[in-house]
A protein has these predicted regions:
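N-terminal leader/targeting and accessory segments in enzymes
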Residues: 1-93, 352-354, 380-381, 385-395, ...
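Residue-level signal for inorganic ion chemistry
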Residues: 8, 38, 57, 94, ...
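Acidic, Mg2+-coordinating active-site environments of NTP-dependent enzymes
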Residues: 8-11, 71-77, 184-329, 354-355, ...
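Phosphate-binding loop of NTP-binding sites
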Residues: 9, 89-218, 223, 229-235, ...
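Active-site beta-alpha connecting loops in nucleotide-dependent enzymes
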Residues: 45-48, 316, 334-409, 413, ...
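Short acidic/polar active-site loop segments enriched in Thr and Asp
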Residues: 63-64, 105, 157, 181, ...
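ATP-dependent carboxylate/acyl-activation modules
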Residues: 109, 126, 317-321, 441-449, ...
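Peripheral docking tails and interdomain loops at the edges
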Residues: 413, 431-452
């Protein structure tokens, strides 16, 4: 939202010198990507201090910079400096003010997995009738979420915002900024256990979104998740549910697996069913789709419209992308991983025709003290899913290979994505089906890049 600097300074309680008529056309915390006319916030991160890049931001056309009062003396030319106690807090304060000024429905989405895909589906369905702002990528933390809120414009009728967390209290802080009218919780899984003592503690952290909803708000909950299904008990607003197994307000029936093309099913609500086609892989994607339909129904989208919208979805970057290469079918799902998501994708392979089903499984991070056992159990589930070979990549992925071996599934462990890529170059054959999945920190896409690059070289 464009704001005059005088108005922005007022909302942030900032002081300083600036041109009276100057206007911020956007907002940035990154001097590398800042655009002319944007307001630069010199926030301090874990490794970098934005105050070191103020001059660079001005060189790229920043209209002004928000700096801390204690750092003001670093700058000889103090024109176009807005001073505050803490630039990050000022960014958040301005974002919260813009959200209140905008004043229209905002849907907040959280969960241990599926947040980004569900956000995309919700926005896609609402866009049938409305102008929707959605958070970009997975910008879902105390830096990214305020920047998304500052993109709100009067013409936007809805906002769909993803909320992530690693520690208790973080969802509440994000919700205090975003003021969601509707909260969606996808599921609770053993993710970030490095920072929590139990899954129940993770659930309590996710519940902060529901606690933050207004009395007339809407809670959209997974009826099949043992934790999320309980979130509506003490909520005084409207509770609507989605699921496949337990009774739910929105469910799927007659699920037909269609291999790499995804699935088809009847979306059922209030006794009415509409056949839908979903070009995303795995049972977890059906849950995400049902969550999206459930939100759409709350805001005037018909069941027919919502169900038909699913057919035009596409997989996001490194999120279940299906690639045909050198006679093999590749499923690039290496954006992130956790035990539940890996299991869902592995089970999806069972419905796909293939000469061999190969799983390239990277280490899953932030699982806490039980991480080794969780990796091992994922490996044990490879056999029943018809997996032919498991390639474990880095660290605790060795336990995935060991678990798979117990179920007579052959495997190999390598230390790096580069070694995995070299193995793929030499061993994948036409007709193979290959799944790549790992936590973001493993950078498993390097294996895919190496494989496709080297294989292309070999073919010339």
């Amino acid at each position: 939202m464009k704001l005059g600097l005088a108005r922005a300074a007022e909302l942030m309680q900032a002081s300083g010198q600036y041109e009276a008529e100057a206007v911020a056309v956007g907002y940035s915390i990154d001097s590398r990507t800042i655009q002319p006319g944007e307001l630069f916030f010199a926030v301090r991160g874990e490794r970098l201090d934005g105050h070191d890049f103020v001059e660079q931001a001005f060189g790229k056309g920043a209209v002004a910079a928000v700096v801390s009062r204690e750092s003001k003396t670093r700058f000889v030319d103090r024109a176009k400096l807005l001073t505050v106690d803490d630039p990050l807090r000022a960014l958040q304060k301005l974002a919260a003010a813009v959200r209140l000024i905008w004043g229209k429905p905002l849907i907040g989405i959280t969960g241990s997995a599926g947040k980004t895909t569900t956000k995309e589906i919700v926005a896609h369905i609402l866009a049938n009738r409305h102008n929707v702002l959605k958070s970009q990528g997975n910008l879902n933390n105390h830096f990214g979420l305020p920047l998304q809120l500052l993109k709100l414009e009067p013409e936007h009728e809805f906002a769909v915002i993803e909320m992530g967390m690693s520690h208790a209290g973080e969802i509440r802080a994000l919700a205090d900024l975003a003021r969601p009218d509707c909260g969606v919780v996808t599921l609770v899984a053993p993710v970030h256990l490095e920072f929590f003592e139990s899954i129940a503690d993770i659930a309590r952290a996710k519940y902060e979104l529901i606690e933050s909803l207004p009395a007339g708000g809407i809670a959209v909950l997974n009826a099949d998740d043992p934790y999320v299904s309980q979130f509506g008990r003490d909520f005084h607003g409207k509770v609507v549910t989605f699921g496949l197994q337990k009774p739910a307000d929105v469910s799927a029936r007659g699920i037909e697996a269609r291999g790499p093309s995804g699935s088809a099913f009847d979306v059922v609500s209030n006794g009415q069913g509409v056949r839908a086609t979903l070009p995303l892989l795995g049972e977890h994607s059906i849950y995400n789709a049902l969550a999206g339909v459930t939100v759409g129904l709350q805001y005037g989208i018909s069941l027919q419209e919502a169900a038909e919208s699913l057919a035009s979805l596409s997989a996001g970057d490194k999120r279940g992308q299906v690639i045909e290469f050198a006679g093999a079918t590749i499923i690039n799902d290496c954006y992130n991983s956790n035990p539940k998501a890996l299991d869902s994708m592995v089970r999806a392979l069972a419905s796909m025709p293939a000469q061999r089903r190969i799983v390239v499984a990277g280490e899953m991070l932030e699982l806490g003290t039980g991480a080794k056992d969780l990796h091992y159990e994922n490996g044990r589930r490879m056999g029943p899913a018809g997996v032919s070979f498991v390639l474990g990549v880095r660290g605790l992925a060795r336990s995935i290979v060991e678990g798979a071996a117990e179920e007579q599934v052959h495997g190999k462990f390598v230390e790096s994505p580069e070694q995995a890529g070299a193995w793929l170059v030499e061993n994948v054959r036409p007709g193979d089906l290959v799944l790549l999945k790992a936590s973001r920190g493993v950078r498993l896409e390097r294996a895919l890049d190496l494989w496709m690059g080297k294989s292309a070289d070999k073919s010339h």
